[in-house]
C-alpha cells in the first residue's frame, strides 16, 4: 500500500527548500552488479560526469543552470558539491537512475516537443528526470527545486528529495526548468505546467495516476 505523506513530512523530506512549489584520491569504483560507476558521497564530480552510463542517460549533473553551467574545481567530491547532509541521498538517487537506465528504461525526457523547441530555443534544456515507482499505478510528484532565479539545485535538493519520495512509493520526477536570462515571461511556471501535462499525457507509459497526483 502506498504511504500518504503529510505536509510536515514533505517539508522534512525536502528540507523545506525544494521550494518554489520541491576523499579525494579514492579510486574510481565500478558497481559489481552493473557497468556504471557506483556513486558515493566521496565520488569525484569529474568521475561522475566522465562515466559513460551517466553521460548516455542524459541526467543533468550540475547545480546551477545559468547560461554556462558551474564547473567544480578538480578534486571536488559529491559531498563537497551538494552538501554533506544531502550527499548520501543524492548518491543513492543517482545510482538508481543509472541502474534504471542500464535496465532499459529511459530516465531523461524533454518536456517540449521538437516543434515547440524550434519556436523557442530556450525550451531545449527543460527536462524531467524520472525515478519509476515500484507500485503500479502510483501517484507521482514533480520536484521543482532551487530558487527559480539562477539555480535549479537538481543535484542536491532535487535528486535527494526525489529519492526519498521514491522510497515512499511515489513515482518521482525532478524538473530542470529555465532560469536566469532564459526565465522571461514566467518561463519556470510554464515549464512546470508543461511538465505536468507531459506526464499526465504519458501516464500509461510512466504507470502513474493521471489525476490526484
Sequence positions of predicted segments:
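Short beta-strand element of the alpha/beta-hydrolase
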Residues: 138-146
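N-terminal cap/lid segment of alpha/beta-hydrolase-fold proteins
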Residues: 78-135
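Cap/lid segment of the alpha/beta-hydrolase catalytic domain
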Residues: 146-157, 174-187
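C-terminal segment of N-terminal export signals and the immediately downstream linker at the start
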Residues: 3, 24-47
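N-terminal secretory signal peptides and thylakoid transit peptides that target proteins
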Residues: 2-18
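Short amphipathic alpha-helix adjacent to the substrate-entry channel of hydrolases
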Residues: 156-173
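Gly/Ser-rich "nucleophile elbow"/oxyanion-hole loop immediately N-terminal to the catalytic nucleophile
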Residues: 198-213
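Short acidic-hydrophobic catalytic motif
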Residues: 37-77
